Amino acid sequence: MAKLHDYYKDEVVKQLMSQFGYDSVMQVPRVEKITLNMGVGEAIADKKLLDNAAADLAAISGQKPFITKARKSVAGFKIRQGYPIGCKVTLRGERMWEFFERLITIAVPRIRDFRGLSAKSFDGRGNYSMGVREQIIFPEIDYDKVDRVRGLDITITTTAKSDDEGRALLAAFKFPFRK
């Protein structure tokens, strides 16, 4: 079991129960899933780019990504409905906790010119979204085998009812928010 999951059960639950005055342990917000999304717009011209992006995402997450397709045709972007334009992975359970631990302890500190993550990226329901400009911050990616530096979106979905609860949950995990 991931250390972060044990830390959540032992420390974070107690801390949040006292902070928000919950009656039951089940009221305490928890991390439900983490979604990684990589939009590869250049895949329209070269299908190989999407395969490389999917391989990178599989290495980062430890799970085979789902290829996302365009929902509707957009002439300005030269895409048609059904074209493969990205890939995504939804992590839950053990893999989610392991990825979350790697994200906080290894990947985020490796971001160039890192000054902390924005605390304003909550969606109003306690879910947090962040963008990563380079996939090479993850140790699973071999820098020499990267064909192109691409970014990805990371969404942390929680059971929190408000942004304050979600922020307190992530802060309890020592999430590096900007001061």
Swiss-Prot record:
InterPro entries: Ribosomal_uL5 (IPR002132), Ribosomal_uL5_bac-type (IPR020930), Ribosomal_uL5_C (IPR031309), Ribosomal_uL5_dom_sf (IPR022803), Ribosomal_uL5_N (IPR031310)
GO molecular function terms noted in the UniProt entry: RNA binding; rRNA binding; structural constituent of ribosome; tRNA binding
GO cellular component: cytosolic large ribosomal subunit
Disulfide bonds, paired cysteine numbers: none
Any one GO biological process: translation
Pfam families with a match to the protein in the record: Ribosomal_L5, Ribosomal_L5_C
Keyword field: Ribonucleoprotein, Ribosomal protein, RNA-binding, rRNA-binding, tRNA-binding
Functional description taken from the UniProt entry: This is one of the proteins that bind and probably mediate the attachment of the 5S RNA into the large ribosomal subunit, where it forms part of the central protuberance. In the 70S ribosome it contacts protein S13 of the 30S subunit (bridge B1b), connecting the 2 subunits; this bridge is implicated in subunit movement. Contacts the P site tRNA; the 5S rRNA and some of its associated proteins might help stabilize positioning of ribosome-bound tRNAs.
Assembly and oligomerization: Part of the 50S ribosomal subunit; part of the 5S rRNA/L5/L18/L25 subcomplex. Contacts the 5S rRNA and the P site tRNA. Forms a bridge to the 30S subunit in the 70S ribosome.
Sequence similarity: Belongs to the universal ribosomal protein uL5 family.
Name of this chain's protein: Large ribosomal subunit protein uL5
Organism: Yersinia pestis
Lineage: Bacteria, Pseudomonadati, Pseudomonadota, Gammaproteobacteria, Enterobacterales
